[in-house]
UniProtKB/Swiss-Prot annotation:
Its main location: secreted. This is Rothein 2.1. The lineage of its organism: Eukaryota, Metazoa, Chordata, Craniata, Vertebrata. It comes from Litoria rothii. Lacks antimicrobial activity. Does not inhibit the formation of NO by neuronal nitric oxide. It is found in: Secreted.
Amino acid sequence: AGGLDDLLEPVLNSADNLVHGL
């Protein structure tokens, strides 16, 4: 990952955790 991907990866990861948390 690099550039925007580097910033989006943790965001998507957090969203994934929230979805699985539900």
